[in-house]
Amino acid sequence: VDVSGDAAAGEKAFRQCITCHVVVDDSGETLAGRNAKVGPNLYKVPGRHAGQIEGFRYSDSMSQAGQNGLVWVEEEFVKYVQDPTGYLREYLGDSKARGAMTHKVRKEDEAVDIYAYLASLGVHEE
């Protein structure tokens, strides 16, 4: 997985994500966040197909994007977190598509750094 951001800066920027997200490794250790369960566990998101965490109820649009082949590489992650619903509408070519994530990461460099931080915690290997 290619990463261009600053993981240390991403750790700080990730604070805006912990209201809804947690990063818990395969052994059950919490690497980031507290106990939020609103959004999916972000462990090993970099390199993973979208909408693939078992037991998490994704929006229909996110599930469809994953089935269509969306993989969380840096470029796609950065575009998504800046405008989740807009991204899914464009990706799926469906003006009615909706993302469940309401928060938008306002700054592109923060989104890049958050991706680097998540990659530092674990990368999905096929």
From Swiss-Prot:
Q: Where does heme c bind?
A: C17, C20, H21, M101
State the UniProt keywords alphabetically: Electron transport, Heme, Iron, Metal-binding, Periplasm, Photosynthesis, Transport
User: What are the BP-aspect GO terms?
Assistant: photosynthesis
What molecular function does GO assign, one term?
A: electron transfer activity
Which cell locations does it reside in? Periplasm
Q: Which PROSITE patterns match?
A: CYTC
Output the SUPFAM superfamilies linked to this UniProt entry.
Cytochrome c (SSF46626)
After translation, the protein is modified as follows:
Binds 1 heme c group covalently per subunit.
Name where it mostly resides.
periplasm
GO cellular component terms, A-Z? periplasmic space
**Transmembrane residue ranges:** none
Alphabetical list of Pfam families matching this protein: Cytochrom_C
Biological role: Cytochrome c2 is found mainly in purple, non-sulfur, photosynthetic bacteria where it functions as the electron donor to the oxidized bacteriochlorophyll in the photophosphorylation pathway. However, it may also have a role in the respiratory chain and is found in some non-photosynthetic bacteria.
**Record's family?**
Belongs to the cytochrome c family.
Q: Which PANTHER family match?
A: CYTOCHROME C (PTHR11961)
Q: What is this protein called?
A: Cytochrome c2
Native source species: Rhodovulum adriaticum
